[in-house]
């Protein structure tokens, strides 16, 4: 490999063409010191200068292989400080010689030294002994753009982590870390903060039901506040209740499961008894003046506020009955008695108060005398021996309520120190001429309990809870049977349902249910059970069918409706045959007859298809009931029959659509 040499530049030689100031003395063809990625340093020849991007291309020969790289201007000037200024260059210590095959004789006698390579010769990178200048600048290698971007992302990540740590620290200062449920509390608060009540309020349209179902949430009591219990109930609108149930994953991570329930009315913990009464029992008061049977009952867990809602505020064990639903109903009853419309009826008001405890009925106004519930010849339920006292004002009604509550059975439970253990029924009866005119039953149900909550209780307490749950279950079954139009309604399953029978099946009966719930997280299971119970009660709608059924009937209901329609059509046809009309039938009458005939044919097709389907199912069951039946043959035969049935049903569907379209057109013309 040819050597290279350095010649001193004399003043007589023409100076080199000056470069731009920021490039210094860097020119194409000079030798510069470079640093490799493995920290080796050697000489290389400058072959190209890019002034726009401020980088320099250098080349060298290493092991008979020509190599090159691009180096930015800053790195070149750091490794070669003598090239930084063209006007006053600093003296440079001689670099270590390049390999003998590439470097010739050098002379450093003059101040200014310019290294000029021989023509078509390139510096060698085989030698590793290249000394750094005697007074070097800071040997700082510029980082690649990729590395710079990585460092930038890392700095942003560290900044975000610092901010998150600061946020966690601030949150830790805001909450009481001694509360074990502060994480759940923050989840609930965050959920409520981002809750859009405008979207939730229209989750389910309000429908008219035979039972008005309302839910009332009570505030946290002193015991729950002392135990740092959380409020997991949210009432975002006037008919929606949300339960934030705390769950735990397999990795012990806690999360919320939010369950939503829709009712006729929902009241939060700030609602007063007057507000609850305005939307629950007050609309039913006037019905008893029209010979109606009204019922309002409170249902819920022990200690959820049933007696508070029905009876009034508590001050210790003393209760202010003037603010309960009992008193509010009595006030409206006596106000309506003075109305000119009902004043002519000469009505008298009576009050009764009895309890149902352990499957037996006791009169609370007659020192808890045991009573019998019997059915008379008119299939009306009568409580034999029940004392009825005439009342003339609200004060007398409150005296009866106070007397009855003083005799009512109560026990201490794990939730409440003074808990009612019986179903209390207070009735306001209107009589005209000694006969029943109307009745309003106000029922304060005993609190439902789970068996798991009474494991440490006495046997008597457990029997009490079992009897209470039995009667509440019977009440729900009766409501469901009425909602599904079952032929039998189990009213005789408990004394409670026997007493309330006329409130459900009477001609002018109207009922309202107030479900009271506890907001604490420890009562979450009981709260969900109460809401599910109330949700099932809501299914008893105005027409006797559950509201969640489809708009169009199916199955046997569809065939029954079609049969009735066909029967009416046939009767009308027979009637028209016997009536002799002297004139010719009009076009409208002719169209009506054609519509009836089409409906009759459709009914016959449907009946034939249904009979064929039932016969086919019986044949399949007989074949498959044998031991040696052919499975493949049965499957093939079933598929062929199904195809035929599908074709018939499709044809019936087309005819029904055409008939419906004709009826719509006819109604528009009329």
Curated annotation (Swiss-Prot):
Its BP terms in the Gene Ontology are: cell division; metaphase chromosome alignment; microtubule depolymerization; microtubule-based movement; regulation of chromosome segregation
One Gene Ontology cellular component annotation held by this UniProt entry: kinetochore
According to the entry, every stretch annotated as the Kinesin motor domain falls at 210-540
Q: Which domain of life is it from?
A: Eukaryota
SMART domains hit by this protein = KISc (SM00129)
Spell out the coiled coil positions from the record.
146-173
Q: Keywords in UniProt for this one?
A: ATP-binding, Cell cycle, Cell division, Centromere, Chromosome, Coiled coil, Cytoplasm, Cytoskeleton, Kinetochore, Microtubule, Mitosis, Motor protein, Nucleotide-binding, Phosphoprotein
Q: Is Repeat found in the keyword set? A: no
Q: A Pfam family name for this chain? A: KIF2A-like_1st
For the modification Phosphothreonine, which residues carry it?
122
Q: What does UniProt say on post-translational modification here?
A: Phosphorylation at Thr-122 by PLK1 is required for activity in the correction of kinetochore-microtubules attachment errors, while phosphorylation at Ser-201 also by PLK1 is required for the kinetochore localization and activity in prometaphase.
Where along this sequence does the record place binding of ATP?
300-307
**Mind telling me which InterPro entries this protein's record contains?**
KIF2A-like_N, Kinesin-like_fam, Kinesin_motor_CS, Kinesin_motor_dom, Kinesin_motor_dom_sf, P-loop_NTPase
Similarity comment: family membership:
Belongs to the TRAFAC class myosin-kinesin ATPase superfamily. Kinesin family. MCAK/KIF2 subfamily.
Q: What is this protein called?
A: Kinesin-like protein KIF2B
Q: What is the native source organism of this protein?
A: Macaca fascicularis (Crab-eating macaque)
Lineage of the native species?
Eukaryota, Metazoa, Chordata, Craniata, Vertebrata
Gene designation = KIF2B
């Amino acid at each position: 490999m040819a050597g290279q040499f350095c010649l001193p530049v004399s003043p007589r030689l023409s100076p080199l063409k000056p470069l731009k100031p920021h490039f210094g003395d860097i020119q194409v063809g000079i030798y510069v010191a470079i640093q490799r990625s493995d920290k080796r340093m050697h000489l290389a020849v400058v072959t190209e200068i890019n002034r726009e991007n401020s980088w320099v291309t250098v080349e060298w020969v290493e092991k008979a292989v020509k190599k090159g790289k691009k180096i930015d201007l800053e790195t070149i000037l750091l490794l070669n400080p003598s090239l930084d200024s063209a006007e006053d260059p600093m003296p440079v210590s001689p670099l270590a010689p390049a390999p003998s095959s590439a470097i010739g004789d050098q002379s450093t006698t003059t101040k200014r030294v310019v290294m000029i390579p021989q023509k078509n010769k390139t510096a060698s990178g085989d030698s590793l002994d290249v000394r750094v200048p005697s007074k070097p600048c800071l040997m700082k290698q510029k980082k690649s753009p990729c590395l710079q971007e990585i460092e930038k992302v890392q700095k942003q990540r560290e900044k975000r982590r610092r901010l998150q740590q600061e946020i966690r620290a601030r949150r830790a200062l805001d909450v009481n870390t001694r509360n074990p449920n502060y994480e759940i509390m923050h989840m609930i608060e965050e959920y409520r903060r981002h809750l859009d009540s405008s979207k939730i309020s229209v989750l389910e349209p309000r429908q008219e039901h035979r039972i008005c179902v309302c839910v009332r949430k009570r505030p946290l009591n002193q015991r729950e506040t002392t135990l740092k219990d959380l409020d997991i109930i949210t009432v975002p609108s006037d008919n929606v209740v949300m339960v934030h149930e705390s769950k735990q994953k397999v990795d012990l991570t806690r999360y919320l499961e939010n369950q939503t329930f829709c009712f006729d009315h929902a009241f939060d913990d700030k609602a007063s008894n007057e507000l609850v009464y305005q939307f629950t029992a007050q609309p039913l008061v006037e019905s008893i003046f029209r010979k109606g049977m009204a019922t309002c009952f409170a249902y819920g867990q022990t200690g959820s506020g049933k007696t508070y809602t029905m009876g009034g505020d508590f001050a210790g064990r003393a209760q202010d009955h003037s603010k309960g639903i009992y008193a509010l109903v009595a006030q409206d009853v006596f106000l309506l008695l003075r109305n000119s419309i009902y004043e002519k009826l000469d009505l008298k008001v009576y009050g009764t108060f009895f309890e149902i405890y352990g499957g037996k009925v006791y009169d609370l106004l007659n020192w808890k005398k045991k009573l019998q519930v019997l059915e008379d010849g008119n299939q009306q339920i009568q409580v034999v021996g029940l004392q009825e006292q005439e009342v003339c004002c609200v004060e007398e009604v409150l005296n009866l309520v106070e007397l009855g509550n003083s005799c009512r059975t109560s026990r201490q439970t794990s939730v409440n120190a003074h808990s009612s253990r019986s179903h209390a029924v207070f009735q306001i009866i209107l009589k005209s001429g000694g006969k029943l005119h109307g009745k309003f039953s106000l029922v304060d149900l005993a609190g439902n309990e789970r068996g798991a909550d009474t494991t440490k209780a006495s046997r008597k307490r457990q029997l009490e809870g079992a009897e209470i749950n039995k009667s509440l279950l019977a009440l729900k079954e009766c409501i469901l049977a009425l909602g599904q139009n079952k032929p039998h309604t189990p009213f005789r399953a408990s004394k409670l349902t026997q007493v309330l029978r006329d409130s459900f099946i009477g001609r002018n009966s109207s009922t309202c249910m107030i479900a009271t719930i506890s907001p604490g997280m420890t009562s979450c299971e009981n709260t969900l059970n109460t809401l599910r119970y109330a949700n099932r009660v809501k299914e008893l709608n105005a027409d006797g069918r559950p509201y969640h059924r489809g708009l169009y009937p199916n199955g046997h209901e569809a065939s029954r409706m079609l049969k009735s329609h066909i029967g009416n059509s046939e009767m009308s046809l027979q009637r028209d045959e016997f009536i002799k009309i002297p004139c010719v039938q009009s076009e409208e009458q002719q169209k009506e007859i054609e519509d009836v005939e089409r409906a009759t044919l459709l009914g016959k097709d449907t009946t034939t298809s249904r009979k064929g389907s039932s016969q086919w199912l019986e044949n399949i069951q007989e074949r498959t009931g044998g031991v040696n039946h052919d499975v493949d043959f049965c499957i093939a035969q079933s598929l062929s029959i199904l195809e035929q049935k599908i074709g018939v049903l499709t044809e019936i569907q087309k005819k029904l659509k055409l008939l419906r379209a004709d009826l719509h057109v006819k109604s528009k013309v009329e």
